[in-house]
Amino acid sequence: MQAKISGFTLIELMIVIAIIGILAAIALPAYQSYTARAQVSEAISLMDGLKSSVADNYFNSMICADNQTVNHFGIAQRSRISGNYVESIHTRVATDPNYNCEMLATFKSTDAAAPIRGKTVLLSMKIVDGGTVWNCSSSDLANEFLPTACRH
């Protein structure tokens, strides 16, 4: 009597491996995009924490704190404001004449996700009716990595 052979054939195993490869090819780019968006949100969160200090300094002195090299008006030096993926946040006078002050977050060139390494996110402040309006933008990040409020 012949023994019954059980198990998977080579073709079945190859089909399973091909399906796993296709699923991985779809999932990996989606995960990388998600990771970059999460890291961009760290920059936005760090800048959100500085909004009131930047606005208070401007309302009290009519000067935008520039923390390029030193602590300025109670805002830490640029290189001291960082995160896991954010190298620094620079507060300064706005480069766009429609705004008063701005904060520029620069991503690390090593730890950040590849699509955002060394790139920047800008948060600009404008005085409107005695209050502040903030605008988020980036000249070098793809829209897919920016929060909805920053997409233009």
UniProtKB/Swiss-Prot annotation:
InterPro entries registered for this protein in UniProt: N_methyl_site, Pilin, Pilin-like, T4P/T2SS_Core
Propeptide feature: residues: 1-7
SUPFAM superfamilies (alphabetical): Pili subunits
GO biological process annotation, one example: cell adhesion
Topology in the lipid bilayer: Single-pass membrane protein
Disulfide bonds: 136-150
Keyword annotations: Disulfide bond, Fimbrium, Membrane, Methylation, Transmembrane, Transmembrane helix
The keyword ATP-binding appears for this protein: no
Subcellular location, record wording: Fimbrium; Membrane
Sites bearing N-methylphenylalanine, chain numbering: 8
Pfam families from the UniProt entry: N_methyl, Pilin
Transmembrane region(s): 8-28
Domain of life: Bacteria
GO cellular component terms given for this protein: membrane; pilus
PANTHER family named in the record: GENERAL SECRETION PATHWAY PROTEIN G (PTHR30093), PREPILIN PEPTIDASE-DEPENDENT PROTEIN D (PTHR30093:SF34)
Family: Belongs to the N-Me-Phe pilin family.
Protein name: Fimbrial protein EcpD
Organism the protein comes from: Eikenella corrodens
